[in-house]
Amino acid sequence: MWAIGGVQLNSRLLLGTAQYPSPQLMSDAVKAAGVEIITVSLRRQLSPQKENYFWDLLRSLPCHLLPNTAGCSSVKEAVNTARAARELFNTHWIKLEIIGDEYTLQPNPFELVNAATILVKEGFEVFPYCTEDLILCQRLVDAGCRVLMPWAAPIGSGRGLMNTYALQVLRERFPKNILIIDAGLGRPSHAAQVMEMGFDAVLLNSAVALAMDPVVMAAGFAKAVEGGRLGYEGGMIKARNVAKATTPLIGKPFLIEKP
């Protein structure tokens, strides 16, 4: 059991709702993984031309909605989108995304901090999508963010942890903040590695939605997240450069050479 934004949760896996072959597969994947928080894009997925089936399906799931500002590239766009999301979904949670480069989808750190400062003052619980840069994360915490969502690698790349050292530093420097890896994971083993490092949760989208079988993959990631967390809580042994026997010598016969 853990808590985020005043909400008690069991699952440490969050799922995005985009790119699935069908809304029903998305729903099945969410249920298979036992997910309790799902993200949704107001700008990319909400359209007056679309049928209400998708939104009805989202609301039917036993999950908390975390709207995001995907597609925004400025403070003004992100803040306006966040305000609209609060009205539409009746939540003060917002996953803050402000992209600074369309090729790498790397967040714009300057706009991100400015937008976070505004939204925190307006009462939002801000979940900022950021890089693993220590100074950026410190500025976000100083702005009032209690949650940080650093990437492991660029969105949708599936590359896994590109900078393990920097991520470990974040965990050590922000022990009281909730840290959720937000992008770049491609395999369940990546998720297990993140959780073994002490991160609080993992957010996935492409790795599940674009898998050959999203439902099976969602279940696999859920088990990996759980296993990694248990490994962290259990206290893993430290790696050694030499072998250490595990079998005691008590009761084991041995020869004594006569002088």
Curated annotation (Swiss-Prot):
Annotated pathway: Cofactor biosynthesis; thiamine diphosphate biosynthesis
Residue positions binding 1-deoxy-D-xylulose 5-phosphate: G156, A183, G184, N205, S206
A GO cellular component entry from the record: cytoplasm
Catalytic residues of the enzyme: K95
Assigned keywords, A-Z: Cytoplasm, Schiff base, Thiamine biosynthesis, Transferase
Listed EC numbers: 2.8.1.10
Subcellular locations according to the entry: Cytoplasm
A Pfam family it matches: ThiG
Cytoplasm recorded as keyword: yes
GO molecular function terms noted in the UniProt entry: thiazole synthase activity
Keyword Hydrolase assigned: no
InterPro entries, per the entry: Aldolase_TIM, Thiazole_synthase_ThiG, ThiG
Catalysis performed (reactions): [ThiS sulfur-carrier protein]-C-terminal-Gly-aminoethanethioate + 2-iminoacetate + 1-deoxy-D-xylulose 5-phosphate = [ThiS sulfur-carrier protein]-C-terminal Gly-Gly + 2-[(2R,5Z)-2-carboxy-4-methylthiazol-5(2H)-ylidene]ethyl phosphate + 2 H2O + H(+)
GO biological process, one term: thiamine biosynthetic process
The family this protein is said to belong to: Belongs to the ThiG family.
Subunit organization: Homotetramer. Forms heterodimers with either ThiH or ThiS.
General function of this protein: Catalyzes the rearrangement of 1-deoxy-D-xylulose 5-phosphate (DXP) to produce the thiazole phosphate moiety of thiamine. Sulfur is provided by the thiocarboxylate moiety of the carrier protein ThiS. In vitro, sulfur can be provided by H(2)S.
Protein name: Thiazole synthase
Species in which this protein is naturally found: Coxiella burnetii (strain RSA 493 / Nine Mile phase I)
Gene: thiG
